[in-house]
Amino acid sequence: MDIHQILIKYWGHTEFRPLQEDIITNVLEGKDTLALLPTGGGKSICFQVPALAKEGICVVISPLIALMKDQVENLLKRNIKAAAIFSGMTHREIDITLDNCVYGNYKFLYVSPERIETDLFKARLEKMNVNLFAIDESHCISQWGYDFRPSYLNIAKLREYKPDVPFLALTATAT
């Protein structure tokens, strides 16, 4: 399916909003991209559509459990396979979720910046067919990365595991 067919099938829209198609095209061309769109501007579609257009899984780094759960719920309502790993899950639940990602049972995996630093995640990441790293609310890198959540500064280390996978940073509030 091309990106327009994906947009119609899963979201019921016939046209992209301004800049969405340009961002999606950049991602599909394998380019690292910064998407600066207003709140309500459809940032999620900018990583969801290209991830659905390609083989593999999109790893989404998100700052808040509530955001992860909301995104996963919205994808599941559209019959798109997605999962999130967050604090409070048992080791077994995390292990099963990551295995399902390795075996191609999900198109989207939502994780926190802290999760990507764990040995278990790194080991499974090497085995995943990742098609995109999406950093949602990427302004948190500079706002929180230097003191409150230093794990944000280590997101770039994912490049060591998947050097050919593009990164898409999304925000409404970059300054």
Task: Locate predicted features.
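Conserved pre-motif I regulatory segment
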Residues: 1-38
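Conserved nucleic-acid-binding Ia/Ib motif block in the N-terminal RecA-like helicase ATPase lobe
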Residues: 4, 58-60, 65-118
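Walker A/P-loop
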Residues: 30-49, 59-62, 168-174
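Loop/turn-to-beta-strand initiation segments
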Residues: 32, 56-59, 81, 105-109, ...
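Conserved helix/coil segment N-terminal to the catalytic DExD/H
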Residues: 41, 48, 89-132, 140-146
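Conserved coil-to-alpha-helix start sites within the AMP-binding
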Residues: 43-46, 54, 65-70
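Conserved catalytic network of the ASCE P-loop NTPase/AAA+ motor domain
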Residues: 51-53, 75-77, 99-104, 123-128, ...
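Post-DEXD/H (motif II) to motif III coupling segment of the RecA-like Helicase ATP-binding lobe
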Residues: 126-175
